[in-house]
Amino acid sequence: KKFIVILFFLSFFSYAQKEYSLNKISSDKIKLDGVVNKSEWADAIQIPLIYEQEPGKNIKAERNTIAYLTYSDEFLFVAFVSFTDPDTEVRASIRPRDNMSIWNDDMFIIRFDTFKDARNNFVFSSNSLGSQFDLRMLNATDDRGKYDSSFNANFISNGSIAEDRYQVEWKIPFSEIPSPNGENQQWNFNLGNRYYKDGKTIELGSQAYDRDNPCEVCQTTDILNISNIKVKKRFELLPYVSASVSGERENIDDKISYDPIERRVGLGINMDFNKTTSLEVTFNPDFSQVEADVTRIDINSAVSLRYRERRPYFSRGTDIVRFSDGAFYSRSISNPSISTKLLSQNSNSRIFFLTAVDQDSPYLVASEDKSYLGQGGQSFVNVFRYQRIINDKARIGMYTSNRYYEGGGYGNLVGIDGLLILNKKWRLNYELFKNFNQEPTKDWIDSSDKIGDRSVMLDGQEFNGDAIYLTFERNTEHWKSYFTYRNISPDYQTDVGFVVKNNRRWGTLRHTYQNIVDKENLRSYEFGTKLDVNYTFDNNLKTISLDGDFQIETIGNTEISYTYDWDIFKNFMGIDFKDLPTSDLNIRSSPTEFFNFNISYEWGKDLAYNEEVPEKGKLKTFSIYASFQINENLNINGLLNYSELKQLETSEYYFSGNIFRLTTRYQFSNFLNLRLIAEKNTFNKSFFIQPLVQWNPNPSTIFYLGGNQNTDLEIDEEIIPLLKFRRSQIFFKFQYLIGLKK
């Protein structure tokens, strides 16, 4: 026994790779019923998850968790069993695929670095009821840039909860895991178990985790050997049919008059040339969103707001075109009639090539303080991206995008970028772009404003600009620091991107201390400061801003954070303002599976940006989100956002209003749900409800039937009853994945 204990503790001081060679079985040996049967998994290797990575620092795991791995010609089989006491609460509910609420559950995780160069990790996870979440983890140090949930793999998962354990079984086709060509594979991998206990989130792993190394994907280093596999090339057809009917009533007492039914059919094709290169083609795609975007308050924004991409075609593979700059924004391609996308990643390179004919082209013009958005006509778009993987510590790339407008005008952008990991603590990111533009001669934007000597109105002018982004980062277990420099010229524009401000030379310095202490009432704490200084290209001071912030994690999985943002000086629309402080308090908590919430409150001084003459005002905003998991099937959540800005000397408002959104979802299974969304917006005096039935058995096959019912709360000074809908739409779509593997 003493010898075993000594060996165990010695393992914590050795971060050496462990190597596993899997045993091969027949595909029909394992019955994927969610119960890990010892006889079925007898040939699998067993890997214990012995490290508690958080909150403990690579200490012995309290909960006994074992993973099982084996494979057949075409599939990788993975199982997890986590042993518990009979009175242990296991968090698990039936969730739709890739729904963020799943991270309130206890989760099993496997990560693959199939190219063994830390370019990314392919992550598969599920809870003990088989609900799935897969993603691509990137080589970044902040959570915003680290996770790409657009990665989707078609795999099978089933799980169950017993008196003394919870468990899950997965069957993953090799064709769904991006990897090098060849029948013999060697990958890096590791395993995880994330669960809740006594008001804390606990993370276990099969490897020790180095908190001094901020590169999480670099720490997936255990070796997995698999031989003589068969990876069939995918040839997939994705036909769809959809229909909708819309109507509107002219007056309150009229019946809704419906237009003729609109019908659409289209086809998608996905084919593999080999294991590393694929082509997608879509004809007459239906990219209507199944779920409405959460409405954001924009009444005091001088620039356009950016929304997350929800269309699977445009989100797949786009991690390679993520830039600090906003050089690529897939939602700038709004209504394509045809599009193609080539994806390729080899042992030392990656390629992304997208083309599209867009029928409705948004046209975004950035300036020093404001942005201008117009709706254009047809355009031809292509985007090309190449990245060279030098090794696990260096990569360089180039990027180009082109947009040619029907009737004249274009926007071309070229650039280079790179990542250099100088050592475990230091890294450098850089992006350099140059644009060449000729405006269309169109009436898409109605404005008499000027940007230097150039009019905002589209009158065929030619211009070009450039942008530079540099970031130095230093990260250790306790200290995180970065310096960012942004140099964006007055005529910089990205026609297939999203840049809303230019004419700035902007430096940011950030320094943070953090510590995981794992005490009864204090799990961790963090505090930091940030300085921003911004000049124009004419060397005029735009902004001096100083922030201070702290964050603690305490009982009940609760995080409390506070930020004091002091704009010492700000110039907006040529007017100088001084002393604009704001405070921001946030509380986020997940005390139980039944209930979690997020509260934020911001107060202080801000500008009324959209007044004819900008002025200071007293700001007050708050947001409350609450989610109730009634049982493993039913979830109800609500979100209330309120914002107001008052004049300093009087009680009059520049603006005041709120948006309330209520979502009810009943999840019959992992694939079938019924959802009802209702939203009331007092800013634009509207109310809508959106009922929807959705069946989604894999990432591509989908059926939904739903509607949109809209009410204008105030028209011609007449108040319409809340459920007296002015506009109505009913729609359905059926899209089915037909796999014709070669």
Task: Describe each region flagged by the PLM.
Residues K2-F12:
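Sec-dependent N-terminal signal peptides
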Residues A16-Q387, G397, G408:
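Structural preference for beta-rich elements and adjacent junctions enriched in aromatics
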Residues N23, T70, R111, S125-N127, ...:
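Residues in well-ordered beta-strands of folded domains
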Residues S27, D73, D105, N274-T276, ...:
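A generic structural motif
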Residues E40-A42, D85-E89, Q132, D143, ...:
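A short local loop/turn or secondary-structure capping micro-motif enriched for an aromatic residue
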Residues I110, D148, N154-F155, S242-A243, ...:
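Short leucine-rich amphipathic alpha-helices used at interfaces
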Residues W170, N188, Y258-D259, S278, ...:
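Catalytic-domain carbohydrate-binding cleft regions of carbohydrate-active enzymes
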Residues N335-S337, L343, G411, L419-L422, ...:
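Exposed, low-structure sequence patches enriched in small/polar residues
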